[in-house]
Amino acid sequence: MEENINKSNTVYRNCFVVFLDIMGFKNIINETKKDGDLARKIKDILIHIANEKINNDDESVPWRNDARNISVFSDSMVISYWSETVINGSLYHLLMDVSYICSDLIEKDVFFRGAITYGHLYHDKNICFGPALVDAYMIEEGVAVYPRVVIDDIAIEEGVRLKSVNNSTEEEKDFLKKL
């Protein structure tokens, strides 16, 4: 998917990236014209997701908030983690974020699909672009055709390579496969 980026390119960082899309959002929005309660529900859901960065902070992992970015726009969400943090294990933390968010959405009867990949990305506050985002979007569109989150092979390989310092390679592989 992603071609090699010139080594002198200092804009992109290597990141684990998830692109999530709320399914049927256009139809839901059309329904909000007639149903003010539904409009409030959608607003509350999007605010909840946008606040996930604040609400899901984990003080036991101090580097996490510097390594993670979350952006919400319309019916989509992007979460990224720099791949090489102080103790690695970024894919694990991304998967935990995704599982919490997806559980919250399912509880609210909101369905989604998404994709996780690894690659070059610029993601800072509200600005997000790069080959990894395009790849995640294309995987979401082409592979995740029903409610689920697909993890591509590149993300798994890099997740194992950049494993937590607390796990062996085999432990990390087993853990990632179980998720």
Ranges and model annotations:
Residues 2-107:
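Catalytic NTP-binding/metal-coordinating core of nucleotidyl cyclase/transferase enzymes
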Residues 82-179:
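Catalytic beta-strand-to-alpha-helix segment of the class III nucleotidyl cyclase homology domain
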